[in-house]
């Protein structure tokens, strides 16, 4: 018999922010994690779109962040958005292709006290020269070819 679980009163959303040194739109072996980046977590009611929760967080060492979310936000749509990078040489917020400036998700599958989300990345101004080798290993063409 299924026993209904009590609503979660608080939990953590955690993830990482990285510098996309190859401007690939995903983590590569040359990516570097960014301490000191800021992000915003915002949840909205799925019925009327009203904002129900907003929190700003900052990355620590290894680009890790963890934000405490108060109360249950089941059946709401939430989004984590990049605000600013901790690195001047890697602060371009991606807007097209595979890379996105934000990550959208629903909080209806929270089990326990932590929810880990996919990493978000800032683009380096220009790709590192070694990136051609990375793309070659992956069997891909570098962007802008």
UniProtKB/Swiss-Prot annotation:
Phenotype for residue 125 to N: In strain: cv. Zard; variant 2
Sugar-bearing residue positions: 111
Documented effect of changing residue 108 to A: Loss of IgG binding
Annotated consequence of substituting residue 39 to V: In strain: cv. Arbequina; variants 1 and 2, cv. Bella de Espana; variants 1, 2 and 3, cv. Hojiblanca, cv. Loaime, cv. Lucio, cv. Menara; variants 1 and 2, cv. Picholine marocaine, cv. Picual; variants 1 and 2, cv
Record bears the keyword Disulfide bond: yes
Result after altering residue 115 to C: In strain: cv. Zard; variant 2
Phenotype for residue 16 to T: In strain: cv. Bella de Espana; variants 1 and 2, cv. Loaime, cv. Menara; variants 1 and 2, cv. Picholine marocaine and cv. Picual; variants 1 and 2
Subcellular location: Endoplasmic reticulum; Secreted
Known outcome of mutating residue 140 to A: 50% loss of IgG binding and 50% loss if IgE binding
Result after altering residue 11 to A: Loss of IgG binding
Domain-related comment: Regions 91-102 and 109-130 are immunodominant T-cell epitopes. Mutations in the C-terminus (135-145) reduce allergenic activity but do not change the ability to stimulate allergen-specific T-cells.
Protein name as annotated: Major pollen allergen Ole e 1
Protein species of origin: Olea europaea (Common olive)
């Amino acid at each position: 018999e299924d026993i209904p679980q009590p609503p979660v009163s608080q939990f953590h959303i955690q993830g990482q922010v990285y510098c996309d040194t190859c401007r690939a739109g995903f983590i590569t072996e040359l990516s570097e994690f960014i301490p000191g980046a800021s992000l915003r977590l915002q949840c909205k009611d799925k019925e009327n779109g009203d904002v129900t929760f907003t929190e700003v967080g900052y990355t620590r060492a290894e680009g890790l962040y963890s934000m405490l979310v108060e109360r249950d936000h089941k059946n709401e749509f939430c989004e984590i958005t990049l605000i600013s990078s901790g690195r001047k040489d890697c602060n371009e917020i991606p807007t097209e292709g595979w890379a996105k400036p934000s990550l959208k998700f629903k909080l209806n599958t929270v089990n326990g006290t932590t929810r880990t989300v996919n990493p978000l990345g800032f683009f380096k101004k220009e790709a590192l020269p070694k990136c051609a080798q990375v793309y070659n290993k992956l069997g891909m063409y570098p962007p802008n070819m």
